[in-house]
Amino acid sequence: MELDFDRAGIEHRTKKLEVGDYVNPENPALVVDRKRNLDELCANLCSGDRGRFWREIRRAKAMGVKLIILCEHGGAVKTIRDVARWRSRYSPFGGRDLMERIYRVHISYGVEFLFCDKRRTGEQIVRLLGRLS
């Protein structure tokens, strides 16, 4: 990821954030949280170990932060609707279950869910954080 930022000439530093993984200091009201695939997203939204993620979602809303979840699943998953066809080898939850949870979080908390190929993650983060809130 650092290489993508370096190539784009973007100054960056590592620091713990209250919410998410990436923020543009010039626009702290917009944050990107990266998920490596739908299995990780499903674990965060559906499993018994989801408390930390839900606290982060609530914290973002309380802070007035627009949270974007960027899932690096790739393949045929380009939109939330595509999630319905997903099948996990690890989770008892299916794609339709996950899609419904995603929609609930989007409607209740204003969280935006986007999907990209892993090779495009850095480029997507740069594009998203350059956008106005």
Language-model segments: residues:
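Conserved catalytic cores of phosphodiester-cleaving nucleases, focusing on short active-site segments
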Residues: 30-36
